[in-house]
């Protein structure tokens, strides 16, 4: 099975990391599964610091589509064209899109037009404000998806109310927690990095707000 995970912005990598690790773990157990990470943007995207992938303990994207535009409709068209080219060169069985960006909506449309199995991570999220571009993206992606991975009961309820069958809905929980747990042992408390004498700090804070001549 060949899986393609599509992300469109920096925050999406935090949610994609647990999926990448799950694919790697399955391969180590002997399962025939391959996973590729596709980023809609450029390799030198300024919003992505060099340490991000090391911090998340995940590999860098396998492919950068290089799509970028301030116009969301133009960006959608660019991603559709570039993702189509990617799929022409990379046999894919399942496409997993993360979140609700224009780029992930574009990838969803291409995947379904090619008859691929489509899964949406963080499905069922709604603002109920159709004037928001992301709300349009959510409706399109969820409507096209074969599998809806929701974060909680509210997501399940939304998907059901909009006509999704129970066989499509999987409540996977808040996947950000998976990343948090995975990195828990590596976390350092601020107090361990910058020692602070709490009593003196508290005294200085109090003295800064006391009237002159007031004895503390």
PLM regions and their residue ranges:
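Conserved hydrophobic helix-helix packing surfaces used for dimerization/oligomerization
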Residues: 3-5, 35, 95, 198-200, ...
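Active-site and donor-binding regions of nucleotide-sugar-utilizing enzymes
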Residues: 4-6, 14-22, 28, 52, ...
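Short N-terminal binding/cap micro-motifs at the start of the first secondary-structure element
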Residues: 12-16, 45-47
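Hydrophobic anchor at the start of a short beta-strand
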Residues: 30, 35, 118, 169
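Short internal beta-strands
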Residues: 35-42
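A nucleotide-sugar donor-handling region in carbohydrate enzymes
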Residues: 42-43, 47, 66, 144-216
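N-terminal beta-loop-helix "entrance" segment that forms/cooperates
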Residues: 42-59
């Amino acid at each position: 099975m060949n899986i393609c995970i599509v992300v469109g912005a920096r925050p999406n990598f935090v949610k994609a990391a647990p999926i990448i690790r799950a694919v790697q773990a399955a391969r180590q157990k002997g399962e025939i599964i391959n996973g590729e990470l596709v980023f809609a943007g450029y390799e030198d995207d300024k919003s992505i610091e060099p340490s991000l992938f090391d911090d998340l303990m995940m590999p860098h994207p396998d492919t950068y589509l290089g799509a970028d535009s301030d116009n969301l409709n133009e960006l959608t068209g660019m991603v559709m064209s570039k993702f189509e080219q990617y799929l022409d060169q990379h046999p894919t069985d399942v496409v997993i899109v993360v979140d609700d960006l224009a780029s992930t909506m574009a990838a969803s449309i291409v995947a379904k037009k090619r008859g691929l199995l489509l899964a949406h991570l963080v499905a069922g999220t709604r603002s109920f404000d159709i004037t928001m571009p992301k709300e349009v993206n959510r409706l399109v992606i969820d409507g096209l998806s074969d599998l809806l991975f929701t974060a909680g009961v509210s997501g399940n309820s939304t998907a059901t109310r909009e006509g999704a069958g129970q066989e499509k809905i999987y409540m996977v929980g808040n996947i950000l927690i998976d990343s948090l747990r995975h990195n828990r042992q590596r976390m350092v408390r601020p107090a361990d990095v910058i020692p602070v004498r709490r009593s003196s700090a508290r005294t200085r804070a109090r003295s800064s707000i006391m009237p002159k001549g007031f004895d503390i």
